[in-house]
Structure formats: structure tokens, C-alpha cells
Swiss-Prot record:
Miscellaneous comment: The deletion mutant gld-3 (q730) makes no detectable GLD-3; it is predicted to generate an mRNA with a premature stop codon, which should be subject to NMD. The deletion mutant gld-3 (q741) removes the fbf-binding site from isoform A, but leaves the gld-2-binding site intact. Animals homozygous for gld-3 (7q41) enter meiosis, but are feminized. In addition, gld-3 protein that retains its gld-2-binding region, does not have the dramatic mitosis/meiosis delay seen in gld-3 null mutants. By contrast, sex determination was not normal; gld-3 (q741) males produced oocytes.
Gene Ontology MF, one: RNA binding
First-listed, main subcellular location of the protein, grouped into a coarse class: cytoplasm
InterPro entries recorded: GLD-3-like_KH5, GLD-3_KH2, GLD-3_KH3, GLD3_KH4, KH-I_CeGLD3_3rd
Region (fbf-1-binding): 860-949
Signal peptide coordinates: none
Domain of life: Eukaryota
gls-1-binding: annotated segments: 57-471, 769-969
Organism: Caenorhabditis elegans
Official protein name in the record: Defective in germ line development protein 3
Stretches the record annotates as Disordered: 459-508, 602-711, 950-969
Gene: gld-3
Functional note: Required maternally for germline survival and embryogenesis. Forms a complex with gls-1 which promotes the oogenic cell fate by freeing the translational repressor fbf to repress sperm promoting factors. Promotes maturation of primary spermatocytes to mature sperm. Required during hermaphrodite development to promote sperm fate, which is critical for determining the normal number of sperm. Promotion of sperm fate is at the expense of oogenesis, possibly through the negative regulation of fbf. Required during male development for the continued production of sperm and inhibition of oogenesis.
Lineage: Eukaryota, Metazoa, Ecdysozoa, Nematoda, Chromadorea
Subcellular localization, as worded in the UniProt entry: Cytoplasm; Cytoplasmic granule; Cytoplasm, Perinuclear region
Length: 969
């Protein structure tokens, strides 16, 4: 930690004012040394970015300033946050039945605080922000006038020109804004180029003369510019500020005398390059439909003005358009002045409707008109600070903008004063710096009719559109809400006019407001309605929803069933309403529907519809399905249908279907299911948990499998250890070095396979398993009374267990769970192929899941066989490791991992078999066992017990006889 300063010590940084310069000036090296000394005293260091700011402070403001677009975005976020809180408060008062206040404190607006938009050449921004020795730059003007000046964002070329490429905004009190405008114009730079091709003095003598005789407030330098014929021509570049224009003219005339001596100077010896925003080319240069303005300037100034040919601004590439003016020094600067007078200027401000000289009607606030006598364009729209719903004591807010040319700024200020009410006792500024402009009498009368100027002071249309949609929805609900009298509100039918609603408050007569006029908030209490009325609305809603699904809509929107009460759930004789949220204000809350759950609506949005047969099947099937019989996270109980839906044994899962074709799971009977076959058979695969898995990374999802199994992937890299053995207690083997590439079946058997226990939190409602009717077998349902020990899990048992599985076929991994239903019908046990089972009953209780607990299963036949994903890893139980030792598996230190994992399972026992030997033994065996999904797990255990008894009888007979003899004595 650095040194801590005492509280009584004077903190120089705390009292530092960036706009107040010290009496003593320091050069860049001295400032940098002082900064390094101050940093080292506090055990800090000066970064490279800070060094650049200290050495070149003018670059800091230009590169790191708050852009105008950032300010607009901040205002939009502020307004959206405010409006959301306001509407939430109104909804809460309605839900609690409390009276609404007459007004709610809003964002304060001041009509005397305006935003002025002007055009400045972007090529001089770096000079405008620099000090230049006289302490006048953008920062000093901001401090002097108490305004906020924002340079435009760095423009990026696009298909259409950027209207804000050179637009500078000045925000503040209208009197201060005009002072800042004049200071910015006075400190604006310009550059003229002097041709040296016809001079009488040698170039090196001129360069020496310029270095030895500098001119105050004028910068001169030499530049080389190639001509069209390839010859390089040298020019003298002269740069100054507008306020130093007289000094530049005197310097240019003196140079003419020195260079040409007694001979007269050429007439067109000076050139000026003026940059213009391409968006305003038609408004500055003119067009064939209005008038060509550059010939007027040429006649008045006897100059030559040239510019690239154009038809319209959209055909001109780039955001900057260059105009070239050639003539003597006086005429060139005069022509520049006339061109600048044609630059667009606008002023924006927010104002209450009651603060206007003539308040407008709410429905007629979208105004765009031209005042012919003053040449001003007035545009008014609803303000972005106006809430969507106004209370009884609140007034509408307007956003007004006045637009014209820069030479007409005096009339623009006058129009601004006339818009405001007389209660604002002030006099608008009357600048006289454009009184001598030629455009007061030379500009055609119809030139401003096609004038258009976007300005930064107006926020983007996105906010206005959001409020327009919000108010339109509220107005539509108030018009089409369920009312006994069927009354509708009349609104003016204007094209761009904004529909508006007023929220009733306690001061108004609440009896005249319909009960369903306002959107029900998401936390509203239930609304009780007579039972027969609600049943009628349920039928109408179901019919409307069916029609919506026939048209291919993803789900009903709250705005589409305004004619009905809020959606309901019918349960016996009790009827409760599920309120919904406003779709604009509460955009983050999902829409809840009693008949269509939230997860069902998501299914349609995520569902593929690329196949024509798939879409046709959906349109036929969707209207007839009973959504009340589908499980949903939005309802508390699930009532199964009387006719359960038939499903195939091995159905393609939703997540497998959405991934690549190689990852689809193959059925046990060898039939590869595809998308068309599944939908033709009418199967549903829309489950919420699968869509939750879709949000994961696809590669990570296939690494971990459906429930944590690494072998769900069909495209695993052979030479990659995709599982952390220390974390999951998986035993990894290895063998000698590789000499040839593995075959397809070796790739499938390269990895370690595990038969493990499922977790007891897996049930049908949560996992949505696929079921298939299996033949009933009563002869093999009994379980041996003898206990099962650790010797149960052996290689021979696994051979018999997997004898009927075709391991050579990729993607075939049988996973079976036998479903037993007890006689009383109160509970159901699901027993997997590892011998563990779970009980699913009304109490949601789960019994112990060990091998001994299998004895508790009664003599019940198999009713269904269920394909279930792998359960999550449980380290409390042993695992059977099926591993094929080949010469391709000695990769990435498998020997160390194998040694570490030998003691990770139950009782420090791992059972390993060679799958290739297993396949060979199955092929050589003449015994044909039935398919594994047609057998009970008790059959497998009984056969295993017999095999163990046959193998151990010879080794234990002697020991048993000795024990019997000792016990007889």
C-alpha cells in the first residue's frame, strides 16, 4: 500500500479544476516528469495511456470523450427504467385496490434548456480541442458557457450516408448555447493552399524565410501533392482560426509580394478544400428540382467551385463530400463563408403542453410544418419523457424541434420564443453575425420545402416506437375489453398520430371505468366469475387457440385474446384466473396460460419446421391434442389421460434430433428412426428438460451425455481422454503402442463402459421416458431366496447379460428399466438392469437402493420396458468396467490413471472384461438367449447364481466337508 496522507494535509487532486489553468505553464517533458515524481512518491507508476494524455492533452478529449450516441443511449435507459418503475407502481396500486394518485413525480423537463446542432468540419477536430497557446478550445468553451459540447462519433462508412458525421451538439440554457455557438465558430479552423509553381524565389529560400519569420496565430508548412500527369507539386499550407482570419489574409498577401516580387500574382493562386457531410449535399449544393446554389456563389465571389458529380446523395459513397474552391485569398474565404451559411442548424427542446403558447390537442401532436414567412421548419412529436399512461393530474409532454439554415438563426430564435408561453419572460438572442449573408434574398422560396435534417437532440425512434406500442396496446384493450355495455372509445384516425390513454385516478369517477379496461398486472389477485360463464369462455378460448395453431402461430399472445377474460384453470367447482403481464412493460416475465403451459409455448419456437412433411403433420395433429393431459411445470398436479399415448421403445430424443445425423440413437431392433418417421407416427417429444439441455454447449453436452455418461457421443476422439478419472472414479486402461488405425467397431469399444446405478430422483414425470409394450412372462419372475454378495458382479455374468446385444453396431447401447406395478395400484417400482429400483407413489418416498433391496420386489410380471438415460454418478456403489485392451489406448498417461483408480470403487474391486473376447465367446456359443429387453432382471440374477454355484462347488467341497466333520464332534 502506498503512503496515506493526513486528513489535515491539503489534497491537491481534490481541489484540481481541469478548466482552470495554473499561472505557470510547463512544457510536455516537465509535466511528465512532475507526474512521475508524484506517482513514485505514492509508490505508483504512470501508465503509457496516462503519459500520452499528459504529453498530448488535446488527444484525450477527442479520443475518450463521451460521444453523443452514448448520451442518447443513457437517456433512453434512464427513461425506460423510470417508466417501468412508474407503471409497476400503478399496477400494484390497482392490484391492491388502492386509489391512484392524481400525479406521480416525473422527470423534470425545462423548455429553456435546448440542444443546438451545428456542422463543423471533422478534419479540424484535433485542432479545435487543442490549446494552441491561447487557452481557447472546446473544454474552455464548455467551462466558460456552462454547456455540454459533444463531438460526433467517428463515422463508419455504410450503404447510406451518416447524417451525424460532422454534427456537433451544444446543450444548455438557450442564452449560454448561443454564446457557445459563437465561440465555437470563432475558434473553428480553416486551411488554404498556396501554389508555388509560378514563384520567382527558389524553394529552399522560401522554406528558410518561413522558419525565420513566423507569423503569430498562423501556421505554415510545405506539402507535396502529385498531379494527374504524375508530376509532384509543392504547396504552402496556411492554417488559422476564424477569429484570426485577418492575420492569415495579411500573411498571404505578404508572401505574394515576396514570391512574385515585381510581377503581379496569379489570380487563382489559392485553393480551399471544404468538407461537407454527404447527407446534406442536396441541401447545400442544391439540386435540379430546387436550384443550383454553387453558381450563385461563383458569381458573387468570382471563384471557381468544383465538386464530384452526383445524382443524389445515396449514390455518393462515403460520409464526407469535398468541395474545392479556387481563387485569390479574399474571394476564397468569402466563398467559404457563403457555403457555411447554407449548413443546416436545428434546435430541440422538451416542453409541457401547458407551457406552449397554443396548447395542441393530444391527438394532433404530430406536427411537421413549414413557416413560409420565416423559413423555419417546425416538427413536434410526443416527448420521450412522457409516460405511456397519464394520470388525471398530469399533462402531455412534447418534443419540439426548429430547423433551418445557419444564416437564418436569428429567425430560428424568434420562432422558439413564439412557441413558448408568455409566462416565460425572456427575450430570445438576436445574433447579427449573419446579417450580411447573400442568402437572405438569393435563396429560392421553395428551397426549404424538401429540407430534412436529423438532429442528435431527438432520441431515436426506438423509444418512441416502444411508447407507441405500449399506449396502442393499452388503448386497444380499453376499446375491446369485456364490458357489459359494449362501449368503445373513439379516437382520431390520423396516419402518424399517437393513440393515448389516461389512467383513472381517485379524483375521477371510478364507476364509469370498465372493470377490464386496464391490463391485469402479473401479481393481481384471482378474479372469481360464475362457473357457467367461465366454462363458456374456456370453450371459446380453446377454439381460438386451435385456430391459432392451425395458422402456425407459436402461441397466443396476451393481446390476441382481449375479448375474453384472463386465462383460467377449471378444477371442479373452483375457478381462478391466472393474470398475465403487460407484454411491453413486463417483458421479462413469461406469459402464463392455464391451458397452454410456458414450456409448451417454448417448444413451438424451438421446433424445427424445415421439412414439409413435418409441418403438414404438425398442422394436422396440433388442434386435436389435449393439452390438459400434458405435464407442465406451471401446474401443480398432473392428470393422465384415460387412453395413454403409445410410444416406441427406442425413440429419437429431441436433443439428438437437433444435433448432427451421426449422433442419433439407433433402436434396439435395428431400425434407425428419423424425423419424418417419428412425426408420421404421431409421437410427441416436447419435454421441458430437453430444452433446458439445449442451452448448454453442444460439445460439452455430448461429453457428459444425457445424465452424466461420457459414452453418449458417437464421435469421440480415440486419442483423447474425455473424462476426468479422478472425479468420476472411472477406470481407464491402456496397452501397447499403436501401429495401425482403429476400425469402426474398435472405436466404439475403445472406451470404458460402465453399468452403474441410477439416482433415485429419476421418475417418469421428470425424465419423460419412452415406453414400449413387452411380452408378459410369469415363469421367470421369482427371485432366489439365497442372498447376493459381491461375487455377483463377474465377467461371466456380464457376458450373459450382454450376449444378445450387437456391440459391433454403432450407436446401440441397450438401457432397460423394468416397470413393476403392485396390485394395490398405490405405487410403482422401476428396476433397472443393475438391480436398483425406485418407488414412485403419492407420498414421493424412495426406498433404499442397494443390491439387497431387490429381494423386496414381489412376484409381479413385467408390464413395460422403459428406455432411460444414464443416471448421475454415485460413488457409493461398485461399477463394472467393460474395457477392450488394444494397442491404441496407450495415450496421455493411461497407466497412471488406471493405477490410481483401482481402489476407487466399492470394496476396492473393479471388474474388467475384454469386449472382443466377449463377442467371440457369444458367437461361438450355441446357446441362444432371449432378447434382453424381454427378460426380467430376476432371470439374469438366477442364472448368475447358478453359474457361481457351479464354478465354486469343486473348490469348496473339501472345505465344506471339513467344516461338517468338525461341527459333528
Amino acid at each position: 500500500m502506498g503512503e496515506q496522507s493526513h486528513e489535515k494535509d491539503h489534497d491537491e487532486a481534490h481541489s484540481y479544476n481541469p478548466f482552470v489553468r495554473s499561472a505557470v505553464e510547463y512544457d510536455a517533458d516537465t509535466r511528465l516528469q512532475m507526474a512521475e515524481n508524484a506517482a513514485s512518491a505514492r509508490k505508483l507508476f504512470v501508465s503509457s495511456a496516462l503519459k500520452d494524455i499528459i504529453v498530448n492533452p488535446e488527444n484525450f478529449y477527442h479520443d475518450f470523450q463521451q460521444s453523443a450516441q452514448m448520451a442518447e443511449d443513457a437517456n433512453q435507459r434512464r427513461q425506460v427504467s423510470y417508466n417501468t418503475k412508474r407503471e409497476a407502481h400503478i399496477h400494484q396500486l390497482k392490484a391492491q385496490g388502492l386509489p391512484l394518485p392524481s400525479n406521480i413525480p416525473m422527470i423534470e423537463i425545462n423548455p429553456t434548456r435546448v440542444t443546438l446542432n451545428m456542422e463543423f468540419e471533422s478534419q479540424y477536430y484535433s485542432l479545435m480541442t487543442s490549446d494552441n497557446g491561447d487557452h481557447e478550445n472546446v473544454a474552455s468553451i464548455m467551462a466558460e458557457t456552462n454547456t455540454l459540447i459533444q463531438l460526433p462519433d467517428r463515422s463508419v462508412g455504410g450503404t447510406t450516408p451518416d447524417p451525424f458525421a460532422q454534427q456537433v451538439t451544444i446543450t444548455g440554457y438557450f442564452g449560454d448555447v448561443d454564446r457557445a455557438r459563437m465561440l465555437m465558430r470563432r475558434n473553428c479552423h480553416f486551411t488554404v493552399f498556396m501554389a508555388l509553381s509560378k514563384m520567382k524565389m527558389p524553394l529552399h529560400e522560401l522554406q528558410a524565410h518561413v522558419r525565420q519569420n513566423p507569423i503569430q496565430n498562423v501556421e505554415m508548412s510545405f506539402v507535396d501533392a502529385p498531379e494527374k500527369n504524375g508530376i509532384v507539386t509543392t504547396y504552402l499550407r496556411i492554417t488559422a482560426r476564424e477569429k484570426n482570419q485577418h492575420e492569415l489574409i495579411e500573411a498571404a498577401k505578404r508572401l505574394n509580394e515576396i514570391l512574385f516580387r515585381e510581377s503581379p500574382a496569379p489570380e487563382n493562386n489559392f485553393t480551399l478544400h471544404f468538407t461537407l457531410s454527404t447527407y446534406y449535399v442536396d441541401q447545400v449544393l442544391g439540386s435540379s428540382s430546387t436550384a443550383q446554389l454553387m453558381p450563385v456563389i461563383e458569381r458573387e465571389t468570382t471563384t471557381i467551385i468544383s465538386y464530384p458529380c452526383y445524382n443524389n446523395r445515396n449514390e455518393t459513397r462515403g460520409n464526407i463530400y469535398e468541395i474545392k474552391v479556387v481563387g485569390n485569398i479574399d474571394n476564397v474565404l468569402k466563398a467559404r463563408r457563403y457555403i457555411m451559411d447554407l449548413l443546416p442548424i436545428s434546435m430541440c427542446f422538451n416542453i409541457k403542453n401547458t407551457d406552449m403558447a397554443e396548447p395542441s390537442r393530444v391527438s394532433d401532436r404530430n406536427i411537421h410544418m413549414i413557416i413560409d414567412e420565416s423559413g423555419i421548419i417546425l416538427k413536434m412529436t410526443p416527448s420521450v419523457y412522457e409516460p405511456a399512461d397519464l394520470l388525471s393530474g398530469e399533462v402531455p409532454l412534447n418534443c419540439a424541434s426548429l430547423r433551418s439554415k445557419e444564416f437564418n438563426i436569428k429567425k430560428l430564435y424568434t420562432a422558439y420564443q413564439k412557441v413558448l408561453s408568455k409566462k416565460f419572460d425572456f427575450i430570445a438572442p438576436q445574433p447579427n453575425d449573419y446579417d450580411n449573408s447573400i442568402w437572405h434574398h438569393s435563396l429560392p422560396a421553395n428551397f426549404l420545402k424538401n429540407f430534412n435534417m436529423p438532429c442528435r437532440g431527438e432520441l431515436s425512434d426506438g423509444s418512441n416506437g416502444r411508447r407507441h406500442r405500449s399506449s396502442s396496446i393499452a388503448s386497444s384493450r380499453s376499446k375491446h375489453s369485456y364490458m357489459s355495455k359494449g362501449k368503445q372509445f373513439s379516437e382520431s384516425s390520423g396516419g402518424p398520430s399517437r393513440s393515448h390513454t389516461r389512467v383513472s385516478s381517485f379524483s375521477e369517477n371510478s364507476s364509469t371505468v370498465p372493470i377490464m379496461q386496464f391490463p391485469t398486472p402479473h401479481f393481481a389477485p384471482p378474479m372469481l366469475t360464475p362457473h357457467h360463464h367461465m366454462l363458456k369462455y374456456v370453450y371459446l378460448q380453446q377454439h381460438q387457440q386451435a385456430q391459432t395453431f392451425l395458422k402456425g402461430a407459436a402461441g397466443l399472445h396476451p393481446g390476441t385474446h382481449i375479448m375474453f377474460p384472463p386465462p383460467i384453470i377449471v378444477d371442479g367447482s373452483f375457478v381462478s384466473a391466472l393474470p398475465f403481464a403487460d407484454p411491453v412493460v413486463f417483458d421479462g416475465f413469461p406469459y402464463v396460460h392455464g391451458l397452454f403451459p410456458v414450456n409448451e409455448a417454448e417448444q413451438h419456437r424451438n421446433h424445427r419446421e424445415s421439412s414439409p412433411s413435418l409441418r403438414s403433420t404438425q398442422e394436422i395433429r396440433k388442434p386435436s391434442r389435449n393439452m390438459g393431459n400434458r405435464p407442465s411445470s406451471s401446474t401443480g398436479s398432473y392428470y393422465p389421460s384415460t387412453t395413454p399415448r403409445q410410444r416406441v421403445y427406442e425413440q429419437v430424443r429431441e436433443d439428438d434430433l437437433r444435433s448432427h445425423i451421426g449422433s442419433r440413437r439407433t433402436s434396439v431392433n435395428g431400425d434407425d428412426q428419423n424425423v419424418e418417421s417419428m412425426h408420421d407416427q404421431g409421437y410427441e417429444r416436447q419435454y421441458p428438460r430437453q430444452h433446458q439441455r439445449l442451452q448448454k454447449d453442444d460439445q460439452q453436452r455430448w461429453k457428459t451425455g444425457s445424465r452424466g455418461d461420457i459414452h453418449s457421443s458417437r464421435t469421440i476422439n480415440v486419442h483423447r481422454d474425455v473424462r476426468n478419472s479422478n472425479e468420476y472414479d472411472f477406470h481407464v486402461g491402456n496397452s501397447g503402442p499403436a501401429k495401425r488405425s482403429p476400425s469402426l467397431e474398435q472405436v466404439q469399444l475403445q472406451m470404458t463402459h460402465h453399468l452403474k446405478l441410477k439416482s433415485n430422483d429419476v421418475d417418469l414425470d421428470h425424465e419423460k421416458l419412452y415406453m414400449h409394450e413387452s411380452p408378459h412372462n410369469d415363469s421367470d419372475t421369482t427371485v432366489s431366496a439365497s442372498g447376493f454378495g459381491n461375487d455377483l458382479m463377474d465377467g461371466d455374468f456380464v457376458q450373459r447379460f450382454l450376449s444378445n446385444a450387437n456391440i459391433n453396431e454403432s450407436g446401440r447401447r441397450p438401457r432397460t428399466v423394468s416397470c413393476f406395478t403392485e396390485k394395490d395400484g398405490q405405487s410403482a417400482r422401476y428396476i433397472d438392469s443393475d438391480g436398483a429400483y425406485s418407488v414412485v407413489d403419492h407420498a414421493s418416498t424412495h426406498q433404499s437402493r442397494s443390491y439387497d433391496s431387490f429381494r423386496k420386489v414381489g412376484d409381479n410380471g413385467v408390464t413395460k420396458t422403459i428406455l432411460e438415460p444414464r443416471a448421475r454418478v454415485e460413488k457409493d456403489y461398485g461399477k463394472i468396467s467393460l474395457e477392450h485392451k488394444t494397442k491404441y489406448s496407450n495415450e496421455y498417461g493411461d497407466e497412471e490413471k488406471s493405477a490410481e483408480n483401482d481402489t476407487s470403487s466399492l470394496g476396492s474391486r473393479q471388474y474388467r472384461i475384454d469386449p472382443m473376447k466377449l463377442i467371440a465367446s457369444v458367437r461361438e456359443s450355441s446357446e441362444q438367449l432371449p432378447r434382453i429387453h424381454e427378460r426380467q432382471f430376476s432371470d439374469v440374477l438366477n442364472e448368475k447364481e447358478k453359474e457361481i454355484a457351479d464354478k465354486s462347488i469343486e473348490s469348496t467341497v473339501t472345505q465344506d466337508l471339513s467344516l461338517d466333520e468338525t461341527s459333528t464332534y
